[in-house]
């Protein structure tokens, strides 16, 4: 029987009553002491990647069962209603906001607070948060630092993609950018004529180098670097990892160029099966004393989202390493950054994470979601009634495990909107 979400037959809907809370998943990866040899276009024996390719195929087959429902607006709407109903953390965001005086309580806020509470970082008092708007990570770090760590101050800088068109809105839903402009590194398109114009796009090598420089000029040392970037892939979830390769490389490179020795890193990823992703994790393993692949409980188990966490940075880039990696971003190709055959033990640990997070937990919950759809697509209210007791258990357990305390008014972030709470 599964350690994650499970169900069985019995009474007509007894399988709903047996849903159990997920655990925070944390898989450690071994540090690599041998020299790092970066390559412009590394080759990898196909046999090394076989099981990762099989994992990708297996997960995509399960994801594809939902594809026909996405083709019709009516069935797509019903599917999202069902998936929303089985979100065990729906409603928790407002509870956290009102009970603990929290700000910008989004799903991102819950995930970051959980990561901070679980990973035991040595210092989070100075942070660079990339791909950040609307600001859930910054708000969670601020809340944690003042209520759990009791730092006298929290210093931060941040960046996000600034839309190229004046008609596109910056995702500053809470006014965190508007009210704290000096903390932000990206610039409006109106400033394009400036020599150091930077719109925050981390797929551009010159932007990455400039963001890292600006961050370290404004804030030294940087104890924590976070990046929560992800491209909207529409309904094409089977290519989610592939379509995000360059973005995830750029946000990681920005962090490695700016994070101080002894610092910690949190990076969003999705599945971990592509050769380039595997090679990027191999690169990380040379720079951090501890490296983990994680899945917070508040990260929806039906999605592929993962967070790579590095603790205690041991060394900075050499000039040659910086040059090679920036050049790869500028002239991007998705071949591995290193010879993967040199990292067999690390790849075994990564594959264990793939099995645990995606082949077990995600597939099981996707199947659970489809079963709920078949039984309740026209009975959403009934589904909510059945799951209400379980949701309370999940949410109460989360609050106990994550040690929430009230944020004093004097420590709140400055926001420029009357709506400073959560997104339901």
UniProtKB/Swiss-Prot annotation:
One of the Pfam families matching this protein, by short name: FtsJ
EC numbers: 2.1.1.-
Organism superkingdom: Viruses
PROSITE patterns reported for this sequence: SAM_MT_ADRIFT
Subcellular location: Virion
InterPro entries reported in the protein's UniProt record: Adrift-typ_MeTrfase, mRNA_Cap_2O-Ribose_MeTrfase, RNA_MeTrfase_FtsJ_dom, SAM-dependent_MTases_sf
Entry keywords, A to Z: Early protein, Methyltransferase, S-adenosyl-L-methionine, Transferase, Virion
Active site residues according to the UniProt entry: 268
Triggers of expression: Expressed in the early phase of the viral replicative cycle.
Positions of the Adrift-type SAM-dependent 2'-O-MTase domain: 103-315
Binding, S-adenosyl-L-methionine: 135, 228
GO molecular function, one term: mRNA (nucleoside-2'-O-)-methyltransferase activity
UniProt record, GO biological process: 7-methylguanosine mRNA capping; methylation
Transmembrane domains' residue ranges: none
First and last residue of the signal peptide: none
GO cellular component: virion component
Name of the featured protein: Probable methyltransferase EP424R
Source species: African swine fever virus (isolate Pig/Kenya/KEN-50/1950) (ASFV)
């Amino acid at each position: 029987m599964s350690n994650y979400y499970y169900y069985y037959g019995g009474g007509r809907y007894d399988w709903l009553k047996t849903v159990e809370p997920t655990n925070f998943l944390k898989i450690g990866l071994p540090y690599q002491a041998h020299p790092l040899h970066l390559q412009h276009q590394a080759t990898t024996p196909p046999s090394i990647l076989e099981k990762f390719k099989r994992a990708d195929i297996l997960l995509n087959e399960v994801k594809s069962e939902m594809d026909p429902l996405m083709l019709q607006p009516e069935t797509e709407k019903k599917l999202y209603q069902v998936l929303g109903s089985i979100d065990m953390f729906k409603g928790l965001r407002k509870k956290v906001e009102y009970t603990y005086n929290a700000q910008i309580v989004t799903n991102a806020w819950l995930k970051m607070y959980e990561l901070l509470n679980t990973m035991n970082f040595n210092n989070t008092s100075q942070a660079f948060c990339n791909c950040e708007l609307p600001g859930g990570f910054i708000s969670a770090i601020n809340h944690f630092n003042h209520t759990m760590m009791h730092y006298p101050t929290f210093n931060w800088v941040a960046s996000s993609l600034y839309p190229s068109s004046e008609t596109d809105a910056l995702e500053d839903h809470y006014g965190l950018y508007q009210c704290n402009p000096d903390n932000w590194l990206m610039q409006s398109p109106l400033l394009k004529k400036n020599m150091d114009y930077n719109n925050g796009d981390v797929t551009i090598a010159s932007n990455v180098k400039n963001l890292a420089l600006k961050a370290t000029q404004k804030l030294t040392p940087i104890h924590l670097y976070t990046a929560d970037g992800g491209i909207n892939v529409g309904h094409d979830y089977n290519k989610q990892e592939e379509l995000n390769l360059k973005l995830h490389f750029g946000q990681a490179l920005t962090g490695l160029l700016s994070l101080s020795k002894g610092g910690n890193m949190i990076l969003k990823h999705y599945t971990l099966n592509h050769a380039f992703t595997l090679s990027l994790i191999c690169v990380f393993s040379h720079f951090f004393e501890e490296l983990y692949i994680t899945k917070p409980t508040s990260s929806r188990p039906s999605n592929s989202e993962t967070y790579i966490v590095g603790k205690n940075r041991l060394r900075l880039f050499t000039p040659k390493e910086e040059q090679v990696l920036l050049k790869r971003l500028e002239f991007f190709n998705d071949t591995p950054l290193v010879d993967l055959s040199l990292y067999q033990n690390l790849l075994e640990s990564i594959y264990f994470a793939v099995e645990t997070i995606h082949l077990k937990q995600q597939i099981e919950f996707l199947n659970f979601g489809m079963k709920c759809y078949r039984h309740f697509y026209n009975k959403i209210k009934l589904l909510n009634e059945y799951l209400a007791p379980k949701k309370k258990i999940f949410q109460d357990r989360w609050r106990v495990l994550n040690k929430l305390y009230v944020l004093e008014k004097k420590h709140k972030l400055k926001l420029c909107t009357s709506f400073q709470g959560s997104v339901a």
